[in-house]
C-alpha cells in the first residue's frame, strides 16, 4: 500500500495520473486515461525487471561440490528464473542477459562443473557448439541458460513483443563476460575487442528489425550528443515507444570505450551504454545500490537519464526478508527495478519484489511532468 503522501507525490509528478494507474493497461477512468498515459515520455515510467534473467539453477551435484568448496559463493548463486516468455507474461519489463564471445563455436561445451559431476541435468551441447554469443553467468560453474544462444533469447523476446504490441518499452541490459575465472582448467575467455563488438551489434540486428528498437541515434536526433538530447527531454512518448525494445550495455568504462570507439556519442550503435552522467554518450546508467545511491539515482532520473537499480542481490534480502533496498529502489525513481524474486522462494521466506499497486508499469514518482 502506498502511503498517502507518496501517492499524492506520484499523482502530482505524472501529469494527473493516479498512483494506481497501470501504464501498460490504462483503465480509461479518471486519472488513468490512455491519452494521458501515452503523453508520458518513456523515461517517466517505473517497471520491474529480473536480474540474470536467463539463469537456470545449478545442478544439484554441482551445487553440492561448489558448496563444499565455497559456501558463500554457493549461497549467492542459489537462485534461478523461469523462461523469458513466462517472465514477460508475469510483468517483467527489464531483462538481463550476460554473454561470452564464441566466434567459432564449441568453446563452452565442456564446463568444469559438468566434468566434476557428469551425471547431472542435461546441457544443450548442440546450441553451445554453434558460433555466436553464448548466454551464461559464470563459465565452468554457473553456465546453464534458458536460452543458451543470444540470438535465441532475442527471438523469444521479439516473438513475445510482436504478440503484445501495446507493451511499455522493454529494457534488456547486458554484461559482456571476459574476465578469466581463476580456477585450474577453466576455459580461456575471448576478449570483446572491436571485432567482437561489431559481432554483438550484428546479432542484435539479425533479429530486431528497424523500428523495433529504441536506439541511441533515434533519441539523439539532431542534437550534438546523446546526453544533450536526453537532457532536452528527447525520449519518445509512451505512444511511440510501445511495442519496442531498448538495449543497454552494463559494463566498465574500459569495455564501453571499445564499443564506442572514436564516436562522439553512440552513432550507429544498437545499444546504449552505462556511463557517468557527464559523458556525451549518457542516456542510460546502472546504479545498483538504491540505499547508498538514492540521491544520485533521483538526480539522474530528474535530469532525464534512464536508470536501472536492484531491489535485492546475492539472495541476501530473500533470506532475511529485508525489504529496505526494495523500498528505496521504488522511491528512488529508477525506471527499472530488478529482482531475483518476482515471486517468493519458499525455501527462504515471503520476500518478493513487485511493483506497488500490482500493475506492470506505473507513473514514475520522481521523473516529473512530460
How should these model regions be labeled?
Residues 13-370:
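Catalytic cores of phosphodiester-bond hydrolases, prominently lipid phosphodiesterases
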Residues 3-13:
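Bacterial N-terminal signal peptides
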Amino acid at each position: 500500500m502506498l502511503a498517502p503522501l507518496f501517492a499524492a507525490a506520484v499523482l502530482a509528478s505524472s501529469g494527473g495520473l493516479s498512483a494506481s494507474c497501470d501504464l501498460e493497461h490504462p483503465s480509461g477512468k479518471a486519472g488513468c486515461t490512455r491519452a494521458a498515459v501515452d503523453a508520458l515520455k518513456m523515461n517517466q515510467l517505473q517497471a520491474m525487471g529480473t536480474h540474470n534473467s536467463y539463469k537456470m539453477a545449478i545442478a544439484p551435484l554441482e551445487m553440492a561440490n561448489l558448496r563444499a568448496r565455497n559456501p558463500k559463493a554457493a549461497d549467492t548463486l542459489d537462485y534461478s528464473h523461469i523462461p523469458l516468455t513466462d517472465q514477460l507474461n508475469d510483468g517483467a519489463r527489464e531483462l538481463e542477459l550476460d554473454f561470452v564471445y564464441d566466434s567459432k563455436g564449441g568453446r563452452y561445451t565442456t564446463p568444469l562443473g559438468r566434468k566434476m559431476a557428469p551425471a547431472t541435468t542435461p546441457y544443450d551441447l548442440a546450441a553451445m557448439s554453434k558460433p555466436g554469443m553464448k548466454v551464461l553467468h559464470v563459465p565452468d560453474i554457473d553456465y546453464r541458460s534458458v536460452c543458451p544462444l543470444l540470438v535465441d533469447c532475442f527471438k523469444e523476446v521479439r516473438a513475445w513483443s510482436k504478440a503484445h504490441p501495446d507493451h511499455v518499452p522493454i529494457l534488456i541490459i547486458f554484461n559482456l563476460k571476459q574476465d578469466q575465472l581463476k580456477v585450474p582448467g577453466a576455459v580461456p575467455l575471448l576478449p570483446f575487442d572491436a571485432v567482437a563488438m561489431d559481432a554483438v551489434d550484428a546479432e542484435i540486428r539479425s533479429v530486431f528489425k528497424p523500428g523495433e528498437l529504441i536506439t541511441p541515434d533515434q533519441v539523439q536526433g539532431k542534437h550534438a550528443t546523446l546526453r544533450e538530447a536526453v537532457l532536452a527531454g528527447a525520449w519518445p512518448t509512451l505512444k511511440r515507444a510501445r511495442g519496442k525494445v531498448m538495449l543497454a550495455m552494463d559494463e566498465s568504462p574500459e569495455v564501453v570505450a571499445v564499443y564506442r570507439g572514436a564516436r562522439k556519442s553512440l552513432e550507429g550503435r544498437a545499444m546504449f551504454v552505462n556511463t557517468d552522467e557527464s559523458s556525451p554518450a549518457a542516456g542510460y546508467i546502472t546504479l545498483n545500490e538504491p540505499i547508498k545511491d538514492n540521491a544520485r539515482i533521483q538526480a539522474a532520473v530528474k535530469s532525464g537519464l534512464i536508470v536501472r537499480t536492484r531491489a535485492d542481490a546475492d539472495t541476501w534480502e530473500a533470506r532475511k526478508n529485508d525489504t529496505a533496498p526494495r523500498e528505496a529502489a521504488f522511491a528512488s525513481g529508477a525506471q527499472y527495478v530488478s529482482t531475483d524474486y518476482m515471486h517468493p522462494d519458499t525455501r527462504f521466506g515471503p520476500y518478493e519484489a513487485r511493483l506497488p499497486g500490482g500493475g506492470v508499469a506505473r507513473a514514475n514518482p520522481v521523473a516529473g511532468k512530460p
